[in-house]
Amino acid sequence: MIGKITPILSGGTGSISHTEEIPEFMPDRFEPGTLNLPGIFGLYGALNWLKDVGIENIYKKEKSLTSLFLENIKRLEKKGTNLQLGGKKEMEGRGAVVCVQTPGRDVSEIAYLLDKNYGIMTRVGLHCAPSAHKTLNTYPSGTIRFSFGYFNTEEEVLLAVKALEEILWN
């Protein structure tokens, strides 16, 4: 079987320097050139970090930040800021990604102002999923997507909420 699999591109062999022919023996047949040492060491460091911090602790932190954002977005919805939460309103069964829409306001403009005035990066639009947005009735404008990770802080989450409130009230 190995003899039937031919790489599309080839170059230096890594083990037989005087020829450009791909070796027939393993693992050299599929491992020409220099290994991606920065990638290997980066992966090693990331795995050690995950082991030290713990996936459960990462999940708890992301869940806490997302819950804080959801609570405050629901408060803004009730306040009449013309902001609508996309997807589930509760934390149960959802990840650390939250989409909001702003009927009557261009989501691209809101995302631009979040970046320009507050340094908050979001993803805006259809998120490569136009059919999903048609199902959610957010097509063609899309939504503003926030995502929270382990290295975010409560202060950053509250700044995002405050920024949305200020932008939508002006």
Give short role names for the model-derived ranges.
Residues M1-N170:
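Pyridoxal 5′-phosphate
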